[in-house]
């Protein structure tokens, strides 16, 4: 019995590089939506919170620290090494410390997430309505 092998041509490095250049990075909003799916929570509220807390993704904390949710310690914004890390911290925090505890509306979340701003939930709701 004779074994025959078929040679499969491997792409050259230049061809691989060309393909890689065509792959677009996901936006922060797309990453948040995907991460919400992973954690099993709806994406509408986290997306609205991210838009509010980052000034529609224009804040320094977002641009320089990959902080998509306004997460901070002693009012100092947390910084993350990558956007993926920042998104995971934000959505994971909401999933584990809010949604898992039954806090599933902007009003319920706001009392814990941003207790200093009594208008926070109203603003989140407005952003959700605008994005529909």
Residue ranges and their predicted role:
Residues 1-132:
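Catalytic cores of secreted/periplasmic lytic hydrolases that degrade extracellular macromolecules
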């Amino acid at each position: 019995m004779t074994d025959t092998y078929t040679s499969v041509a491997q792409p050259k490095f230049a061809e691989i590089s060309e393909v890689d250049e065509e792959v677009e990075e996901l936006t922060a909003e797309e990453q948040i939506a995907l991460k919400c799916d992973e954690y099993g929570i709806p994406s509408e509220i986290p997306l609205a919170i991210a838009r509010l807390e980052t000034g529609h993704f224009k804040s320094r904390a977002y641009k320089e620290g990959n902080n998509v949710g306004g997460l901070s310690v002693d009012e100092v914004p947390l910084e993350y090494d990558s956007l993926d890390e920042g998104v995971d911290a934000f959505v994971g925090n909401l999933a584990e410390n809010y949604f898992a505890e039954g806090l599933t509306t902007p009003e319920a979340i706001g009392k814990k997430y941003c207790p200093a701003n009594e208008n926070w939930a109203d603003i989140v709701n407005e952003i959700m309505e605008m994005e529909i």
